[in-house]
Structure formats: C-alpha cells, structure tokens
Amino acid sequence: MNNNDIEYNAPSEIKYIDVVNTYDLEEEASKVVPHGGFNYIAGASGDEWTKRANDRAWKHKLLYPRLAQDVEAPDTSTEILGHKIKAPFIMAPIAAHGLAHTTKEAGTARAVSEFGTIMSISAYSGATFEEISEGLNGGPRWFQIYMAKDDQQNRDILDEAKSDGATAIILTADSTVSGNRDRDVKNKFVYPFGMPIVQRYLRGTAEGMSLNNIYGASKQKISPRDIEEIAGHSGLPVFVKGIQHPEDADMAIKRGASGIWVSNHGARQLYEAPGSFDTLPAIAERVNKRVPIVFDSGVRRGEHVAKALASGADVVALGRPVLFGLALGGWQGAYSVLDYFQKDLTRVMQLTGSQNVEDLKGLDLFDNPYGYEY
C-alpha cells in the first residue's frame, strides 16, 4: 500500500475456520488481505533470516514420548498474576489488527475473551480502548506501551489503560527504532488508519504514516529508570518485553519488573538475532523463578508451547497465527486458532505423559545434536 491508495479493503467475513496447522493459515490469509497489509503482518527484518531462525530453533530441543504415565484428559488450564486462563497462552500485543479485518482489535478481543485467556492491547492499536473493551466484554487485559518522549504523556496513557481495566503493563523495550523491514520498504507501506491511543504524541493520527515515522515520534532513550517509573506510577505489575539476554532480565527484575517477556519481536527488529527459543533456557536460569516469564516469537504448534514451558516459560504469547485467523474469519476465525492450539497442546500432553501444565514445566527435553537438519 502507498499514499496513492484511497481505501484499504480489509476482509470482513465472520466464520469459524478449519485449522489443520497454523503454517497454512499464512498462505490462506495472503489471498484475502491486501498486499501491503499482509506483508506488514507477515514480514520481518532484512531477508527474514531471524524469522526462519525462530522456526528452526524448535528443532534444537525435542520432546520425549512417555509411556504408561497414568494420564487421561489433560488439563491445560493455568494461572498467571492471579488470572485463571483456559490454556498456557495469551494474545501478544500486535499493532494494527485492522490490516487483517474490519473489526480491528475488537474482533481479536472477542475471540480472546470467548476462549478464556488474556488480551494484550498494543499502544499502536487501530481501535480505541472503548472499542476493544466492548469486544472483551469484561475479559482480562494487559496494556503494552510504546513510550512517548514526554513523560507526562506516558503517565496519561498509563492512567487511561488502568481506568480501562488493564491489570499489567508491558513495556516494549526492543523497539526504540524500527527494524529494517524489507517488505515494508519495497511496498512503501503506510498505515491506512489512525492509532487513537498514541495519536497525542504522533505528528498526526498515524494514518498515512510509515513505521519509521511512528517510531521516530516515540522515545528512543529507554533506561532502567523507565521501568521503575512505569511500575511506580501505574501501581501495576510490569513485564519488560524484548528480553533476549540474561543480563537484561536480571537488570529488569532489579529495577522493578514483575515479569520477563522473552521475545525478538517476531524477528521484526534486530536482524541476525538468535532464534528466540534458543535464548529462553539461559534467561530462565538467570530469572530462577523470581518472576513469571512470558515467551513469544515463532510459536506455531502445541509442541512449541510444551517446549517453551519445559524450558522455563510460564505462558507463551501468540501473534501472527491469531491475526491470520482473524483475517480468514473475524473473531470466529481467531477463536478457531486459539481452539486449535489448545487441542494440539492437549494431544502433546497426552503423548508426553503430562496431566497438567506443571507436568509440562517439568518435562526433560532431548538436546538434538543434529540441529535443524535432523
């Protein structure tokens, strides 16, 4: 999409979809989402090596089948920060759901609420707090902040999020500038609609702006003090998102973080960074259960959820697959994806002898000496 486009025609159909696997959803979504919007959602930095590394990293550790473990009807439910959720996954904060469907974040929110897990609301949402809240219908929500340069604007946004019902804040700290996203550059991509939550600090509403313009209006000089100030002002638990190094996890906890979010931003930021799953074990070891860990980047199967939990995560966050489901069927399509993950995880739990989520966290993994080519 470019500035000459008059109208962005996102899909609008609402229907449940059949999900065989989430990889196929990407190709299906490419047929219904406008070219620029699809490539914004699906794309990553550079030639997308790190996106491929996110997928290949799962092959570095394998699951042992376990026999005669006295397991039947595994229980996928768990709890994080006092929220009981149906399965150990939540919705990741993603900008601009309206690229995938006309219902925007409100559609995703309804799917998340109907399923029974937590919605992470992005500051770069194309919908208002009120619209998203209507979709959630009382369901739990966390709020992800991209910081403004003006601290008072940050405080105002945090106050609004808290008034809206947010029970935790996610500080995305890995995006002080945009990654070099080749697809968006080639497409001359600009956002076709506004970002009402952060338009107060943009030079405009975000409509017609590029990602570089938007990141340029946000705070680049994020410091440990910002973690302290967000926690102190909001009075809410703060997750620091974008952690890929154990020392950063340790710093965040010491400066007041109540949770660590292991993520490489879906491979959309630093090019030639490690596959996100490869970084998780060392971070979990350093965290040593002091605070909960959320993991994202590359989760596509029930096996991936199981491996992440066995490697130290408490829950995982789902991103692109849910948006592809939204594109293909609105809230019902997004719900179908969440339902697929639960059913796939239940199957994995049965085959690994895991009656509940705590059993998953205790699984031993096989270190694959052959790597991806095994």
From Swiss-Prot:
GO terms for molecular function: FMN binding; metal ion binding; oxidoreductase activity. Binds 1 FMN per subunit. Is widely used in biosensors to measure the lactate concentration in blood and other tissues. Optimum temperature is 35 degrees Celsius. L-lactate oxidation is competitively inhibited by glycolate, D-lactate, oxalate and 2-hydroxybutanoate. InterPro entries: Aldolase_TIM, Alpha-hydoxy_acid_DH_FMN, FMN-dep_DH, FMN_HAD, FMN_hydac_DH_AS, L_lactate_ox. It catalyses: (S)-lactate + O2 = pyruvate + H2O2. Catalyzes the oxidation of (S)-lactate (L-lactate) to pyruvate, with a reduction of O2 to H2O2. Cannot oxidize D-lactate, glycolate, and D,L-2-hydroxybutanoate. May be involved in the utilization of L-lactate as an energy source for growth. Homotetramer. Belongs to the FMN-dependent alpha-hydroxy acid dehydrogenase family. NCBIfam families: L_lactate_ox. PANTHER family: 2-HYDROXYACID OXIDASE 1, S -2-HYDROXY-ACID OXIDASE-RELATED. The proposed reaction pathway consists of two half-reactions, in which FMN is first reduced by L-lactate to become subsequently reoxidized by O2. This is L-lactate oxidase. The lineage of its organism: Bacteria, Bacillati, Bacillota, Bacilli, Lactobacillales.
